[in-house]
Amino acid sequence: METHRKTLLHLLKERAYKHGQFTLSSGKESEHYINCKPVTLSCEGNALCSHLMIEHVEDNSVAVGGLTLGADPLVCGIAQKAYYSGKHIDALIVRKNPKGYGTKEVIEGNKP
């Protein structure tokens, strides 16, 4: 498990962390910026994240979810890892705003 954690930290350092001048969503300036998407959207990074995060999902859980776009690869990876571990845990994706057409859902997926 420690090897997985170290490998993930290395990937985050190499692919997610940036040093420079950045304007944050708050409007503040920062010399540091972390964008985990290059890691969570890679096959290796997603597998490592899912492997490490599934340990924190309670045994009686039926779904994992999070806000789109950042959580999308994580919840899908965790759901897949759960399936291959013999557990039934679905993925849910939460929109920032309701979809403007069709069912106008805020939460996508098989809701419990």
Where are these regions (language model features)?
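Active-site-facing substrate-recognition patch
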Residues: 1-59
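Conserved hydrophobic/aromatic pocket- or pore-lining residues that grip, position, or stack substrates
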Residues: 27, 64, 91
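Fold-independent oxyanion-binding glycine-rich loops
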Residues: 36-37, 67-68, 94-97
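Glycine-centered small-residue hotspots that permit tight backbone geometry or close packing
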Residues: 45, 65-66, 100-102
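Short helix-loop-beta connector
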Residues: 58-62, 111-112
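Short glycine-rich phosphate-binding loop at a beta-alpha junction
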Residues: 60-70
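Short, glycine/charge-rich flexible loops or terminal/linker lids adjacent to PRPP-binding catalytic cores
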Residues: 74-112
